[in-house]
Amino acid sequence: GNSYWDGSMSHFHWCDGYAYQASDFGETDATTGEWKIKTSPSVSYGTNGFFILKDGNSVTDQSPNTNNFTVAAGNLTKTEDCPSNVFCTFNPLDTGTDTGSLLNGNTSYSQSQGDSIGTIMGPKGGKWYWEAKIGSGHGGAGANDSNYYFGACFLKENNTWATNHGAMGICNGGNQSNTFALYNNTGSGSITQPSVSPPAAGTIVGIAVDMSGGTSSIKWFFNGTEVGSITGITHTDFLGCTVVNQRFTGTATMRSIEYNFGNGYFGTTAVSSAGTNASNLGIFEYDVPSGHTALCTKGLNE
């Protein structure tokens, strides 16, 4: 057919001639209350049934049948995201007027100009880490990169991401025209500005958010080295923290950025040398800062 699945799949069962209940494939965790997968359900597959995408990107039938599939074109990208541990992604329902294009399970974003986009998770505490690989169209301060940001936003009731964010980027307005800097719009905290050039295409930016104490902090890393921070952010009335994606204005060419929230990929390219991660949740290019973990459902429940 000419219709294509635009998303991620895991543990795909087709039970030919049978109508099973959801409880045959999943159950409620007695400790956390989460709905969790039954990795080996007791079901029958009939003649034409199959079970693919079990614990990876294999389309070889894992049922007693041999109804194997082949990939007609391209590649199936493996992801750590699965029914038992859902990782953060961007939310296509939480966008501005110019949404750009979301790809690779809503982790890659391409846009020429327009608004921000939110994510599906917004924790109220904890220590979190994610990475973003700068893609095409980012050449440094100047008209072609006006107004792009990435960082974290501490949400308050009836506020948008632009109200209480701490972000790294280039601003083309006010008295800091086309200045690469950290911008703190949270109403509190102090900034350690970067003394490096704007990240060029290919740079992997690590972002670490600490909401574990009475105040919060955001730190930025270029290829594993810390380059700037905002510390001492008060958050007593924050409802949660979300990822700040880029927000472009102007008439520049298409620009892109690829996020790794722990899936181990930037777009369709796997990390080249995974860093250490004490929590063992997620795969990142560089070492995860002490005490931090991936923004995922297992991390939220720790």
How would you describe each model-predicted region?
Residues S8-N67, A73-C82, K219, V227-S229, ...:
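Extended recognition patches within non-cytosolic domains
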Residues L182-I204:
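Short, aromatic/His-centered strand-loop micro-motif at the edge of beta-sheets
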Residues S110-N175:
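Secretory/extracellular carbohydrate-interaction modules
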Residues M9-H13, I52-L53, D61, W130-I134, ...:
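Short hydrophobic/aromatic patches on beta-strands that form ligand-binding or substrate-lining surfaces
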Residues G17, A200-S217:
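Localized edge beta-strand/strand-to-loop motifs within extracellular or lumenal beta-rich domains
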Residues G1-M9, T249:
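Extracellular glycan-interaction patches encoded by glycine-rich segments
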Residues D98-P123, G189-P194:
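Secreted extracellular polysaccharide-interacting domains
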Residues W35, F222-N245:
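Short, solvent-exposed beta-strand-to-loop segments that form ligand-recognition rims
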